[in-house]
Amino acid sequence: MNDTPAAPRETLSRIAANVEKVMKGQAASIRKLLAALTGGGHVLLEDAPGTGKTTLAKALAKSLGAGFNRLQFTPDLLPSDILGVSIFDQKEQAFRFHAGPVFTHVLLADEINRASPRTQSALLEAMGEGQVSVDGTTRRLIEPFFVIATQNPVESHGTYPLPEAQMDRFMMRFSPGYVSPEMEVAILGDQETAHPLEGIGAVATLEDLAGARRAARAVPIAPELKRYIVELVGRTRTAEGVQLGASPRASLALMLASRALALLDGSGFVTPGHIQELASPVIAHRLALDPQARFSGLSGAGVVEAVLKAVPAPA
C-alpha cells in the first residue's frame, strides 16, 4: 500500500474483496456495510446467532488496520462501562480518565437490546454527537468511529427494544441471513485448519477511507433524484398502518448512502437504482407501525416496498 490515499473506488473494492474472503456468500451485506461506512453512518444487524455478524465486524476492522472493540450488552451494563470513567490517582493526587471501549474505530455493540434504555442511550448519543461527556468533560471520539450493533429478532425475553428515536440513529438496518448450502460447505472447508480471519490483513488505510468519504460526498446527484428521495420518505408519513413515518434524517441518510454506493459501483453519479436498492435498509427500521397493522403482518419493509411501487422514478 502507498502512503498516499488510493483511488476511492479502488479502496472500497479492495476492502469488499478482502472481507468476502472471510464472509463467503455475503456480497450484498458487505456492499451495504461499506455504503454505510463510507456514507458516515452506523449499522444495526438484525439476525439469528451464528450468521457471522461478529466475523463481519472483525474482518472490516482488519481490512482497514483499524482499532476494534467488542462490547457484549447485558442488563447490568452501565454507561460508564461504555464511555469510561475518571479514577482518582493517589500518587498524582488527580483524576485520570480511563477510556471505555467506545474509544475505537470499529465498535461491535453485541445484542444492544439486552442493555437498559439508559445504557443504550449512552452509546446512541455518542453515535449521534461523535463525542461523550464524562464527569463534566467533553471528549471527542476517535475518527473514524463506526458502530455495528446487533440484535436477535427472535428472542424477546429480557430485552429492551430500541425506541424509534434511537433506531433513527442507525443509517441502515439489515439482516445478513443464511448463505446457500454450497457456500456453507465452502465455509466448513475454510475452517478445517484455522479461522479465515487469521489469513487476512489490512488492504487499506484509515486515510484511504477518509478519502473515500470525501469522494462519496462529492458524487453528483440530480435535483430530480433529491426530490425522488424526499417523495419516498414523505409517503411513509401518510402510508396506511404507519403511526410515525420517517424523518428528514432518513432523507439525508438515503442520499449519503446512495452517493457512497454509486462510488462503490464506479458510477459518476447517483441513479434511481442506487436509491431503490438502499431504500428499505435505510428507511424501514425508522417506521412505527400501529398495533393493528403489525398484527395483520405489515412490516416496515412492506411499507417501503409499497411506496417504491407507488412513486415513479425519474426517467
PLM features: what roles do these ranges have?
Residues 2, 6, 236-315:
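C-terminal engagement/docking regions of AAA+ P-loop ATPases
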Residues 63-91:
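AAA+/P-loop NTPase substrate/partner-engagement loops
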Residues 47, 110-111, 122:
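Walker B catalytic acidic pair
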Residues 89-94, 115, 119, 127-219, ...:
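Canonical AAA+ ATPase core
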Residues 48, 82, 150:
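P-loop (Walker A) phosphate-binding loop of NTP-binding proteins
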Residues 7-48, 230, 234:
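Pre-Walker A (pre-P-loop) alpha-helix and adjacent loop at the N terminus of AAA/AAA+ ATPase modules
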Residues 37-74:
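Walker A/P-loop
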Residues 31-35, 88-108, 137:
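Conserved alpha-helical scaffold flanking the Walker A/P-loop in AAA+ ATPase domains
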